[in-house]
Regions:
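Extracytoplasmic "Venus flytrap"
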Residues: 31-33, 39-60, 68-80, 223, ...
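Basic- and aromatic-lined ligand-binding clefts that recognize polyanionic substrates
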Residues: 46-48, 53-57, 145-198, 202-210
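Alpha-helical, coiled-coil/dimerization segments enriched in small aliphatic residues
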Residues: 61-82, 182-208, 239-250
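Acidic/His-rich segments in extracytoplasmic proteins that coordinate ligands and/or metal ions
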Residues: 64-143, 227-235
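Short, low-complexity, disordered segments immediately C-terminal to signal peptides
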Residues: 7-16, 24-45
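Structured C-terminal subdomain patch of bacterial secreted/periplasmic proteins
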Residues: 44-45, 128, 213-268
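Extracytoplasmic substrate-binding proteins
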Residues: 109-176, 248-268
Length: 268
């Protein structure tokens, strides 16, 4: 996602209206910040900024998950929180956010929540996903559920990786240029990354440098696309989606990326 500044006046304006609601919440909400580094007992209430954090939370074993920013909002920083959003934060045990989403702290402050703020590293690289899911499970007290999810995830990832390698044109790993936040999809395909770009716009110098590497594929971030990245290079551009759907399931993100990559490599 783009690192954009966020407008938060709506959050601050609504905080006064929710002051009494937050102040009258149950004791669990007011003490949820205690023992923050210790595993929990019972199932936590989790508020997440987007479906990406939500999918990590679900994979870790959380069940009571509230997503603040609807999937239909292309740029999450453009979203103005509603009173119901702030009320949910006031009752949460955990609030998950990414470091490029500074409004998460403002939401927590405005709602008067005692929830634990948890910064999540959003990257679909399998090693990073496994590490984050395991860390969250430790906080939530849901290690068994997370371990079960990881078993299924590892099996599906291995299958997709083998399928994509079997689809390599001429049996050789394709050379790719990838946006920095879609590098995980190059790894999924077993592709050879010859260059990266973004999140800033590609400069003329970068355009010349990347085109000279003669990639067969360009992996573009669907959430930050600026159009054709390497025009006249002959490379096929593949749109990669990072964010899960409203079902908060990470696996379709990998399946969809694999389908797009196979199509670009000439395999239906």
């Amino acid at each position: 996602m783009a690192r954009t500044r966020v407008r938060i006046p709506a959050v601050l304006a609504l905080s006064a209206a929710l002051f009494l609601t937050a102040g009258c919440g149950n004791d669990a909400s007011s003490t949820s910040g205690e023992g923050q580094d210790q595993p929990r007992t019972g199932k936590p209430s989790v508020v997440v900024t987007t479906t990406w954090e939500g999918a990590f939370a679900k994979a870790a074993g959380a069940e009571d998950i509230k997503v603040i920013v609807p999937q239909s909002v292309h740029h999450a920083p453009d979203y103005d929180p509603k009173p119901s959003d702030l009320a949910a934060v006031a009752k949460a045990d955990f609030v998950l956010y990414a470091p490029f989403e500074p409004y998460a702290a403002k939401i927590k402050e405005a709602a008067g929540s005692k929830a634990k703020l948890v910064e999540v590293e959003l990257d679909n690289d399998p090693a990073k996903v496994s590490a984050e899911v395991g860390r969250l499970a430790g906080l939530f007290g849901t290690a068994d559920a997370a371990a079960q999810w990881k078993t299924g995830f590892d099996a599906e990832y291995t299958k997709l990786n083998k399928d994509l390698q079997a689809a390599w044109p001429g049996g050789s790993s394709p050379s790719v240029v990838t946006q920095v936040f879609t590098a995980w999809s190059a790894k999924l395909a077993g592709a050879t990354t010859v260059g990266t770009y973004g999140p800033e716009a590609v400069t003329p110098a970068q355009l010349a440098e990347l085109s000279a590497k003669k990639p067969s594929l360009v992996l573009d971030n669907a959430h930050m696309s600026t159009g054709t990245v390497l025009p006249d290079s002959g490379a096929k551009q593949v749109k990669i989606v990072n964010y899960p759907g409203d079902d908060l399931d990470l696996l379709p993100v990998y399946r969809n990326a694999a389908a797009e990559l196979k199509k670009a490599m000439g395999t239906p």
